[in-house]
């Protein structure tokens, strides 16, 4: 294992990103640089009761910040969670947000930061990522934001969007604004060492899904391609290590970086994995990373006729023998087996009762637009049923 101190550094892309073990100690200074004196730390209820959150709040207080805590967030955050967070922000007279946690906490916190100072009457759903909806919001009213991920998967800490569940319609909506991206990001591997192996695996596969779908998306974006393929190499090298040895700080740090790389790369686009994972998460309240991990080989198989060339290049970069889509799928299957990822959706309690509805929801999901093949609702239904039954 190499000297972990060599990973202590900073860069801008475009957020100011601080990496290294113990960098959470820099949080108060980063808040002050953004003009915060009374930040609201937003996280999920599971993390809120852990010592790490109290330690962060106490450290902020010792540095002169009046930091509050909001943790009323579901595993798949809802519009009601965001509204409650906005109320807490206003009632506590806060002036910034610390987004702390996994994808749920980060997404909810970013949405709160977006909405906290907007004009009265502006609906969160009016900012769904459709056309120029983002122009409905006042970008200058978005409050300062520092993101601190405690899982390595969603990459939401460097993203310009939040995925929020519309409970009334039972659908996940992507809320977007170009100024939602956090100004500061702290990637501290010590915050992730307590993750159980199953969560490490599921979130790590989520990072892989972002890189992989960005790699396969047909749009012209060479920078995203380069970031995506290097992100996948880091997943290959470091996810099994982080899974097997949770205290491996080098592996944990590199998975945090791979996660951020995935979310940076997918500005090129996502695809059918996410087009299916979003409705499945909304309908079954299932873990997003686990859904993408299970769906991955089935979507690659369905896209096979359109992704031959990028799969050959990917295999060569990852040193996979006999480059091609079949070999890439085999690599995914082998990785999933090492991480004890289930082979089918049925194994996590998802039945086929809503197959038609899932197909109809997937085909209109924003992620479907950048899939290499323009699947129909019936195509999505078939992919879902294959994944539900384990037919590859």
PLM features: residue spans?
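N-terminal small/polar loop signature for handling phosphorylated ligands or for N-terminal nucleophile
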Residues: 48-123, 240-252
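Glycine-rich phosphate/pyrophosphate-binding beta-alpha loops
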Residues: 153, 260-292, 365-370
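Glycine/threonine-rich beta-strand-loop-alpha-helix active-site module
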Residues: 80-189
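Carboxylate- and glycine-rich phosphate/diphosphate-binding segment that chelates Mg2+/Mn2+
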Residues: 158-268, 378
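An N-terminal, well-structured beta->alpha segment
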Residues: 1-70, 391-392
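Gly/Pro-rich interdomain helix-loop hinge
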Residues: 283-354
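Short, amphipathic C-terminal "tail helix"
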Residues: 352-392
């Amino acid at each position: 294992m190499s000297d972990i101190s060599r990973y202590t550094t900073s860069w801008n892309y475009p957020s100011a990103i601080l990496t290294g073990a113990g960098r959470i100690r820099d949080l108060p200074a980063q808040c002050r640089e953004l003009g915060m004196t009374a930040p609201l730390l937003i996280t999920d209820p599971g993390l809120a009761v852990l010592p790490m959150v109290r330690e962060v709040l106490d450290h902020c207080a010792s540095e002169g910040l009046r930091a509050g805590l909001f943790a009323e967030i579901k595993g798949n955050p809802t519009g009601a969670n965001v509204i409650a967070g906005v109320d807490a922000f206003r009632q506590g007279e806060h002036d910034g947000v610390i987004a702390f946690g996994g994808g749920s906490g980060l997404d909810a916190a970013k949405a709160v930061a977006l909405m906290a100072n907007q004009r009265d009457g502006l609906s969160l759903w009016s900012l769904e990522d459709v056309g120029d909806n983002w122009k409905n919001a006042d970008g200058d009213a978005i409050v300062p934001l520092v993101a601190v991920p405690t899982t390595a998967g969603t990459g939401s800490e460097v993203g310009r969007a939040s995925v929020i569940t519309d409970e009334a319609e039972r659908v996940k909506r992507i809320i977007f604004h170009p100024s939602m991206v956090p100004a500061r990001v702290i990637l501290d591997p010590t915050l992730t060492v307590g993750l159980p192996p199953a969560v490490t695996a599921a979130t790590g596969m989520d990072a892989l899904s972002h890189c992989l779908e960005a790699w396969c998306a047909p749009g012209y974006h060479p920078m995203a391609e380069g970031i995506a393929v290097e992100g996948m190499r880091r997943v290959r090298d470091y996810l099994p290590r982080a899974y097997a040895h949770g205290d491996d700080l080098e592996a944990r740090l590199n998975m945090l970086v791979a996660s951020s790389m995935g979310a940076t790369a997918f500005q090129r686009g996502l695809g059918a994995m996410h087009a299916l994972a979003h409705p499945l998460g909304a309908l079954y309240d299932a873990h997003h990373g686990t859904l993408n991990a299970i769906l991955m080989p089935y979507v690659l198989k369905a896209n096979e006729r359109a992704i031959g060339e990028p799969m050959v290049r990917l295999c060569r970069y990852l040193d996979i023998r006999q480059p091609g889509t079949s070999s890439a799928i085999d690599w995914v299957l082998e990785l999933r087996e090492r991480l004890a990822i289930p082979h089918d959706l049925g194994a996590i309690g998802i039945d086929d009762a809503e197959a038609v509805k899932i197909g109809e929801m997937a085909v209109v999901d924003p992620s479907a637009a950048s899939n290499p093949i323009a699947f129909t609702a019936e195509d999505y239904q078939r992919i879902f049923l294959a994944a539900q039954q384990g037919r590859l």
